[in-house]
């Protein structure tokens, strides 16, 4: 038997599929020092959030949490990451805007949004009423169009604002009109 074929079973060998947590030396020392305090491990905690000044959050995902039996003192082990809720809201709004614009482009590529929506400028010009004839419009849609300026208030967009913010339709419509038809700004205004 040669040296190359010799396999010595190491006691620290980890079997495949096992989950083992490797700790740094300072963390091992801290854990050993805390063992003597009689701390009890708290199960079922998935995330710990610590709020700092200027609305900055320190977030520990999948932490190990221990509680001191004599007081309300908790010790948290894990990797803390800085999270800014303002930037998270902006990123979420940008992602939502990108998704909605992509959906609009796909709908336009498939021939329009709804039945009766003109697919081209020529069709729109053919369907346009002449400047001489001014027939009265239905009362419900006319008030929305006149109050909102040049854009059309869509019930689908109002329902989207209601779903995203949880406010009633009147507040959603008011925010949508005050933001001049900008869906993202209306949602951000109500949150």
Swiss-Prot record:
GO terms for cellular component: nascent polypeptide-associated complex; nucleus. CDD domains: NAC_NACA, UBA_NAC_like. Pfam families: NAC, UBA_HYPK. It is found in: Cytoplasm; Nucleus. GO terms for molecular function: phosphatidic acid binding; phosphatidylinositol-3,5-bisphosphate binding; phosphatidylinositol-3-phosphate binding; phosphatidylinositol-4-phosphate binding; unfolded protein binding. Residues 127-139 have a biased composition (Low complexity). Keywords: Cytoplasm, Nucleus, Protein transport, Transport. One of its GO terms (biological process) is cotranslational protein targeting to membrane. Residues 126-149 are annotated as: Disordered. Residues 153-191 form the UBA domain. Residues 24-89 form the NAC-A/B domain. Part of the nascent polypeptide-associated complex (NAC), consisting of EGD2 and EGD1. NAC associates with ribosomes via EGD1. PANTHER family: NASCENT POLYPEPTIDE ASSOCIATED COMPLEX ALPHA SUBUNIT-RELATED (PTHR21713). Belongs to the NAC-alpha family. Component of the nascent polypeptide-associated complex (NAC), a dynamic component of the ribosomal exit tunnel, protecting the emerging polypeptides from interaction with other cytoplasmic proteins to ensure appropriate nascent protein targeting. The NAC complex also promotes mitochondrial protein import by enhancing productive ribosome interactions with the outer mitochondrial membrane and blocks the inappropriate interaction of ribosomes translating non-secretory nascent polypeptides with translocation sites in the membrane of the endoplasmic reticulum. This is Nascent polypeptide-associated complex subunit alpha. It comes from Cryptococcus neoformans var. neoformans serotype D (strain B-3501A). The lineage of its organism: Eukaryota, Fungi, Dikarya, Basidiomycota, Agaricomycotina.
């Amino acid at each position: 038997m040669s040296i190359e074929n010799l396999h010595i079973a190491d006691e620290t060998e980890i079997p495949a599929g096992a989950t083992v947590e490797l700790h740094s030396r300072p963390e091992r020392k801290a854990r050993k020092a805390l063992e003597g305090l009689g701390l009890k491990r708290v199960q079922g905690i998935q995330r710990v959030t610590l709020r700092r000044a200027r609305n900055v959050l320190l977030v520990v995902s999948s932490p190990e949490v221990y509680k001191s039996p004599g007081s309300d003192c908790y010790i948290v082990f894990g990797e803390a990451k800085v999270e800014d809720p303002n930037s998270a809201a902006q990123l979420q709004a940008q992602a939502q805007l990108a998704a909605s614009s992509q959906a609009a482009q796909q709908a336009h590529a498939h021939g329009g949004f709804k039945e009766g929506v003109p697919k081209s400028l020529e069709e729109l010009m053919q369907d346009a009423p002449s400047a001489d004839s001014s027939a009265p419009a239905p009362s419900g849609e006319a008030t929305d169009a006149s109050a909102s300026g040049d854009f059309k208030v869509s019930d689908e967009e109002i329902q989207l604002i209601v779903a995203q913010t949880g406010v009633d339709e009147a507040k959603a419509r008011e925010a949508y009109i005050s933001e001049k038809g900008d869906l993202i700004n209306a949602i951000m205004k109500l949150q």
